[in-house]
């Protein structure tokens, strides 16, 4: 069974605000944790990455149009802290995020997918030697930090971009699923060209900080991973093409 809208449903325009990330060579990893080393050279091709994390209103449309498949909403879906339509969609598993990408690809004709870890880090650093997507200053330096992310995420466009390409919330708000299987020692064997992670594993990779940790794991090189079926309220995703 495909992922087409339900019979009789109104076809509504689905648009993603894409940012073109230029291809090139960069130095990946090199942070304080063992799984971020060794620092190594990576070459990625140009790709597009969404300006924002997938929002609740976007994910709700996916749920509505694929309800015949019986995919449940994330367990936190109706809690007030996550209910604003411009909040990031919180709680999708990696499997849910991949299904969303397949649905959006069919809906729009664009080949939508999750970014690789290498692509995410390329977008975050953007030809700069910086600790965080917004620069070298720690998260505590961000505007109004004392009052943000205490009870949950914030709308994806609540604050102006601090990134040179214009990304919103990159490294903030929710952990973002990546396409790769995760291995702590992958950097020891990673190919130079367009690395896509190991061939198998038990956990899928994610990048960026989250509201639950007051975004303190937001470094560009920081890696995290959980099993692909889990649904956590500080996990979301951003699509690539």
Can you annotate each of these PLM segments?
Residues 1-12:
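N-terminal amphipathic/basic-hydrophobic helices that include classical n-h-c signal peptides
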Residues 15, 64, 118, 240-241:
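Short amphipathic alpha-helical segments
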Residues 233-241:
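Short, structured beta-strand segments at or near domain termini in extracellular proteins/domains
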């Amino acid at each position: 069974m495909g992922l087409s809208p339900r019979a009789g449903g109104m076809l509504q325009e689905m648009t993603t605000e894409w940012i073109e990330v230029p291809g090139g060579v960069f130095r990946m990893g090199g942070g304080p944790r063992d799984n971020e080393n060794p620092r190594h050279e990576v070459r990625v091709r140009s790709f597009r990455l969404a300006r924002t994390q997938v929002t609740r209103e976007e994910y709700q449309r996916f749920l509505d149009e694929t309800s015949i498949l019986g995919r449940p909403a994330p367990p936190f879906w109706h809690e007030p802290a996550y209910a604003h339509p411009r909040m990031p969609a919180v709680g999708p598993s990696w499997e849910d995020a991949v299904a969303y990408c397949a649905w959006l690809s069919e809906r729009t004709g664009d080949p939508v997918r999750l970014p690789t870890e290498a692509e995410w880090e390329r977008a975050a650093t953007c030809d700069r030697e910086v600790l965080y997507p917004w620069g070298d200053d720690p998260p505590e330096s961000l505007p109004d930090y004392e009052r943000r992310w205490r009870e949950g995420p914030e709308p994806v466009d609540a604050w102006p971009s601090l990134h040179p390409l214009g990304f919103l919330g990159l490294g903030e708000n929710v952990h973002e699923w990546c396409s790769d299987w995760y291995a702590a020692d992958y950097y020891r064997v990673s190919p130079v060209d367009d690395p896509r992670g190991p061939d198998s594993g038990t956990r899928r990779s994610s990048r960026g900080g989250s509201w639950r940790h007051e975004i303190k794991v937001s470094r560009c090189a920081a890696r995290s991973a959980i099993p692909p079926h889990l649904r956590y309220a500080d996990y979301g995703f951003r699509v690539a093409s």
